[in-house]
Amino acid sequence: WIMGHMVNEIYQIDEFVDLGANSIETDVRFDDNAMAEYTFHGVPCDCRRWCHKWEYINTFLEGLRRATTPGDSKYRSELILVVFDLKTSQLSSSNAYKGGKLFAEKLLRYYWNGGNNGGRAYIILSIPKIDHYAFISGFRDALKESKHEDLLAKVGYDFSGNDDLDSIRSALNKAGVKDKEHVWQSDGITNCIARNLNRVREAVQNRDSANGYINKVYYWTIEKYVSVRDALNAEVDGIMTNYPNVIVNVLNEDNFRNRFRMATFEDNPWEHFTR
């Protein structure tokens, strides 16, 4: 999965898919009442990126739905996965559950079209703080209460704060998520700073273990050719990047073209990939 980073305006969906992304990451900001309000990263953000692009969340979700609905004039068949980077630091731990419920209701209305021929992309809820695991509980409960529990088949989970893996596993379990139940594990840091792959390798080992909790591992945010090669050699499933074309180029190199390929819609993002 080539994951286009910081896609916060609708026009950027086409921009990143044109560069080779089959997945995007979008930043979600909340108001004081725990309601998702707009897509926005803000400063600081990655080097060589403009941090201030934004869209009202309802508008963005409608644009995203069109980009991922077969038959729509804006449809991009390549776009199969969306990571919502949920800026829950604005929420209190006690408000996280409410935030999750409200976000599920918003996705149901504006992205899934009330469960009637909505967008087809898989969704990952990416939360920076393990203390906010109740966001996941609220999200899941809202879909169950609205009789759309079937949509949870399209939803996965990630904690992005580079916490200890055992602590993340515990937080997921508290949220009602079983081991290897649609779990993506991220590791990374802004592209302005170098980071070693020690924790990535630990996560990959967990993913490949019979008693691990992880389905997929992704690394963020990189675009240097050497960093991309190192990440692929560490056997990650996804790479988040500002330059999807760099990942495409590396995948076409002799060392990688027979080991990796781009994921398609037929590839289940919740299944462990075995060579």
Curated annotation (Swiss-Prot):
Residues where Mg(2+) binds: E25, D27, D85
InterPro entries the record matches: PLC-like_Pdiesterase_TIM-brl
Expressing tissues: Expressed by the venom gland.
Lineage summary: Eukaryota, Metazoa, Ecdysozoa, Arthropoda, Chelicerata
Required cofactor(s): Mg(2+)
GO cellular component: extracellular region
Function recorded in the entry: Dermonecrotic toxins cleave the phosphodiester linkage between the phosphate and headgroup of certain phospholipids (sphingolipid and lysolipid substrates), forming an alcohol (often choline) and a cyclic phosphate. This toxin acts on sphingomyelin (SM). It may also act on ceramide phosphoethanolamine (CPE), lysophosphatidylcholine (LPC) and lysophosphatidylethanolamine (LPE), but not on lysophosphatidylserine (LPS), and lysophosphatidylglycerol (LPG). It acts by transphosphatidylation, releasing exclusively cyclic phosphate products as second products.
Cofactor binding description: Binds 1 Mg(2+) ion per subunit.
Protein name: Dermonecrotic toxin LruSicTox-alphaIV1
Claim: rRNA processing is one of the keywords in the record: no
Disulphide connectivity of cysteines: C45-C51, C47-C192
Keyword Magnesium: yes
Assigned EC number: 4.6.1.-
Catalytic residue list: H5, H41
UniProt catalytic activity: an N-(acyl)-sphingosylphosphocholine = an N-(acyl)-sphingosyl-1,3-cyclic phosphate + choline; an N-(acyl)-sphingosylphosphoethanolamine = an N-(acyl)-sphingosyl-1,3-cyclic phosphate + ethanolamine; a 1-acyl-sn-glycero-3-phosphocholine = a 1-acyl-sn-glycero-2,3-cyclic phosphate + choline; a 1-acyl-sn-glycero-3-phosphoethanolamine = a 1-acyl-sn-glycero-2,3-cyclic phosphate + ethanolamine
UniProt-listed GO biological process terms: killing of cells of another organism; lipid catabolic process
GO molecular function: lyase activity; metal ion binding; phosphoric diester hydrolase activity; toxin activity
Top-level taxon of the source organism: Eukaryota
Record localization: Secreted
Transmembrane segments: none
UniProt keywords, alphabetically: Cytolysis, Dermonecrotic toxin, Disulfide bond, Hemolysis, Lipid degradation, Lipid metabolism, Lyase, Magnesium, Metal-binding, Secreted, Toxin
UniProt similarity note: Belongs to the arthropod phospholipase D family. Class II subfamily.
